[in-house]
């Protein structure tokens, strides 16, 4: 079943298999390009030639019947790549129209060289007039975006923005060189007009802005080409400065390739306890329990309100249920502390509410986790809202008044969506989304553990190790109620089994969650609209028991 899912980042050779699982800063790459070129005994013009040729090959293979290519070139090296593409397209018999943005200073040396080579084969270009409407040949059937590269920060200037908006409105396929113009290569922010590409060809390394933030709306299918620099990029000194990992479909085999011992028993597979389901929110605890059981926890126990005990046991008889009746703060905390002694993993949040029940659960969980640092504590939903109250002294927080002391919990996992993240950081949602990687680092520091920042291009960051990952799985169908409850159950169940450290457990849980949603969307061409959270649960065993390449066959390069 996993083999039916399409890879989100295509590669040309097996040597690129490792590199598409790592991400470097675009700024680092710009500084490193001279050394990269020198390693191949070529100059930067030679490297541009490789990039343009690689992009041409990608686009020509995708669009074999398109006869008239429009190449839009800007004033930087992205435009230089466009000239190289134009030359190869012309040599292949395509009709090529090159439109150049006006610029007041000379082209960079490499771009000027590519422009000269284009003109040397008889190529021509037109310069767009400032303020004039964009005039395009009527028979153009492919638009190549070479306007702006990875150095853009902030919205494009108005003339660029006008062109971008115009081509986005045309019923013609659009492809982007390295990154869609207008998209921030470091953060994935589209601060203004941004090219909506059907395909993007990127070079040498993946950049974070292609994978998170608003990238999913603009990048289309991603194609990675290393330009023959695989050995140079995988050297330890380069791997050490990689910004983060890209966790993707084939990582399923790395996380779950080791089979469960034939001598396993329910005690050895971990005991997870889930706290949630206050009055009116029983479904959340139920979905979380089902996910925890299905991902392989040895024993699952749920603390919830009495009215949900029977429905939960009917739906998920494998789970144990403890009904919590009291609303007295100290009695609540004591009951929960006693229950927590049984568990190896705690998860607090699904349907928790922010009343006395929720406040007691969070207080007890933090106290217990501080005393039992070996246990994993997962916090989600209203547990995070209550935690924000502790941090910022808001009404409804587990501590009234000033900020409460919070323990350092290296084995904690918090799983905020952008709204919860904004409350935890006391900022706007827009501030979180502007730089999701930076937000995840700040969030992980709150308890000194691991943060999973939900959203397209989920970010996982571990405070103690400073490791970061972008999880490239999942789809828009996950924008529905209950998805976070399922994720909490998956994380609790995986943490209970202690297959990996907390960071890798979090990455694995996010990956299972996203891949399950992709499986649902792919079945019989169903699509993403109307996916229910419970549908993901039934796909989980297929993922965590998937057979594929052994982890030993996918060894990471030294330096990681």
From Swiss-Prot:
The keyword ATP-binding applies. Residues 249-560 are annotated as: ADP-dependent (S)-NAD(P)H-hydrate dehydratase. CDD domains: YXKO-related. Binds 1 potassium ion per subunit. Pfam families: Carb_kinase (PF01256), YjeF_N (PF03853). It comes from Leishmania major. Gene3D superfamilies: 3.40.1190.20, YjeF N-terminal domain. K(+) binds at residues 78, 145, 181. Its cofactor is K(+). In the N-terminal section; belongs to the NnrE/AIBP family. Keywords: ATP-binding, Isomerase, Lyase, Metal-binding, Multifunctional enzyme, NAD, NADP, Nucleotide-binding, Potassium. Residues 29-235 form the YjeF N-terminal domain. This is Bifunctional NAD(P)H-hydrate repair enzyme. Its EC number is 4.2.1.136, 5.1.99.6. (6S)-NADPHX 2 binds at residues 351, 485. ADP binds at residues 454-458, 475-484. The keyword NADP applies. GO terms for molecular function: ADP-dependent NAD(P)H-hydrate dehydratase activity; ATP binding; ATP-dependent NAD(P)H-hydrate dehydratase activity; metal ion binding; NAD(P)HX epimerase activity. NCBIfam families: yjeF_cterm, yjeF_nterm.
């Amino acid at each position: 079943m996993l083999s039916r899912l399409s890879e989100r980042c295509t590669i040309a050779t097996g040597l690129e298999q490792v590199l598409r699982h790592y991400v470097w800063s675009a700024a680092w790459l710009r500084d490193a390009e001279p050394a990269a070129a020198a390693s191949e005994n070529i100059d930067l013009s030679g490297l541009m030639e490789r990039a343009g040729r690689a992009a041409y090959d990608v686009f020509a293979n995708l669009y074999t019947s398109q006869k008239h290519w429009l190449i839009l070139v800007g004033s930087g090296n992205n435009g230089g790549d466009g000239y190289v593409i134009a030359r190869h397209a012309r040599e292949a018999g395509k009709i090529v129209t090159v439109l150049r943005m006006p610029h007041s200073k000379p082209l960079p040396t490499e771009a000027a060289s590519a422009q000269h080579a284009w003109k040397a084969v008889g190529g021509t270009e037109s310069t767009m007039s400032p303020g004039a409407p964009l005039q395009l040949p009527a028979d153009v059937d492919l638009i190549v975006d070479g306007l702006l590269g990875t150095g853009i920060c902030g919205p494009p200037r108005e003339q660029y923005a006008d062109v971008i908006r115009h081509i986005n409105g045309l019923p013609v396929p659009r492809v982007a060189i390295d990154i869609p113009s207008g998209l921030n290569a470091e953060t994935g922010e589209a601060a203004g007009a941004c090219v909506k590409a059907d395909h993007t060809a990127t070079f040498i390394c993946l950049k974070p802005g292609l994978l998170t933030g608003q990238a999913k709306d603009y990048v289309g299918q991603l194609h990675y080409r290393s330009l023959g620099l695989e050995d140079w990029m995988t050297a330890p000194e380069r791997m050490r400065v990689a910004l983060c990992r890209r966790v993707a479909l084939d990582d399923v085999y790395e996380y779950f390739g080791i089979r469960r011992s034939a001598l396993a028993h329910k005690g050895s597979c971990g005991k997870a306890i889930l706290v949630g389901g206050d009055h009116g929110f029983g479904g959340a605890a139920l979905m979380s329990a089902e996910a925890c059981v299905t991902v392989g926890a040895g024993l699952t126990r749920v603390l919830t309100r009495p009215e949900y005990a029977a429905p939960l046991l009917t739906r998920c008889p494998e789970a144990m249920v403890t009904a919590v009746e009291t609303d007295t703060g100290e009695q609540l905390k004591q009951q929960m502390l006693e229950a927590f002694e049984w568990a190896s993993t705690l998860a607090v949040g699904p349907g928790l509410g922010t009343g006395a029940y929720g406040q007691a659960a969070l207080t007890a969980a933090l106290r217990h986790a501080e005393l039992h640092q070996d246990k994993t504590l997962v916090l989600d939903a209203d547990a995070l809202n209550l935690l924000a109250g502790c941090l910022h002294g808001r009404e409804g927080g587990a501590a009234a008044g000033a900020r409460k002391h919070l323990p350092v919990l290296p084995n904690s996992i918090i799983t905020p969506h952008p709204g919860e993240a904004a409350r935890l950081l006391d900022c706007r949602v827009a501030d979180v989304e502007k730089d999701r990687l930076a937000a995840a680092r700040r969030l992980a520091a709150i308890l000194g553990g691991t943060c999973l920042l939900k959203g397209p291009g989920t970010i996982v960051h571990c405070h103690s190790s400073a490791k970061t990952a972008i999880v490239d799985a999942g789809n828009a169908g996950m924008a529905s109620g209950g998805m976070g409850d399922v994720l909490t159950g998956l994380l609790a169940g995986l943490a209970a089994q202690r297959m990996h450290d907390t960071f890798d457990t979090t990455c694995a849980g996010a990956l299972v969650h996203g891949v399950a949603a992709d499986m649902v969307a792919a079945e019989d061409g169903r699509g993403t609209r109307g996916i229910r959270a419970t549908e993901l649960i039934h796909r989980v065993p297929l993922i965590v028991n998937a057979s594929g390449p052994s982890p030993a066959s996918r060894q990471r390069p030294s330096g990681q």
